[in-house]
Amino acid sequence: RNLFDKDHFSFSRVNWMTNIVDDMSYNFINFDRGQYGVNVLFFNYGEQNESDEFGIIQSQFTPLSAVYGFSYARKVNKYNLGLDVKLITHNLHTQNAKGLVFGVGGYFPKVYKDLDLDVMVRNFGFAPKFGSWKSELPTSVNVAGTYPYKEWMFFGQLNRMKKHQTFGMGTSYNYKNMLWGKAGYYIDDMHKLTYPTFGLDFKYDKYIVGMSYIYGDKTLPLGNTIRLTINLEL
């Protein structure tokens, strides 16, 4: 569960696939106020080489993608329902594309004792189109559950897509509402991705600084990925 109950601002930075390249990264900025939220993600694919038909490098370019998001949520009886809208833009040197995708979901507390349930349908709508080629959206149905026990929180999430599914599970430990230790495991059989994750959040005054880490050797593209997040309660 989110550590913030109030309006907040957050910034995340990730160097992506560092086992393969050293200049691919993304930045994520999020602002939540009341029932509304806005966010933006900038993805930098790193410097690429442009070559001619003989393989001779002519120039370099840097493809970029951005996702601009808006969310709205409201409480209906004891449940929370939400809507998510995202504008996707791609600038891939010689090709540009835009898309508009949506997501709807609900949070259902205490469906069985202290078990909370989240259900969401994500990434459906209008896929980005590059010339005459239309990309395919990763539309998914996500079902997640969380269960608290004393200072512990246990969670799991199943993501069902058109051709495959992924699953993640984990636990977190709350130490005096100032330090949270986290550990999890992710499974994607189709893409042969299975790895453990670890995280640590530290709260001071209105700030929460978080760091997460994907463990893996050099055969795992996402291995040794570190995400740093800074949250500010407003």
Language model feature labels by segment:
Residues 1-234:
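Subset of outer-membrane beta-barrel
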